[in-house]
């Protein structure tokens, strides 16, 4: 459908409730997509012959204008793990709502989050609070990298 020209952007795919099944679709619809490696670590599993080591990579992709995807991949070589993670991130791409949700600013431009956002996974809890224009990103380095790829410029 994408190659035929029936679908011209990712918003149409999400509006229809369809899923992206191939990473090449995202590359075609978002040509200015940037890719950042968040983490690469060595993981091991115990087998009957000993330990089997592999590399696990976590990659974030985004266009700095409201689209963001995160993915993980494992392989025997670092490069292959990064490639698998990048493909997984393209398949997991989503739209990030942006706006001016800070009571201090009120400019109406999409530089921050429109409201306070909380996410929890395991024992980790992440809370993103909208910030006024010019504040910057007050977060850890990994969180800054992910928020920049999503197009968020100001938040706590």
What are the language-model segments listed below?
Residues 1-156:
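Ribosome-associated RNA-binding proteins
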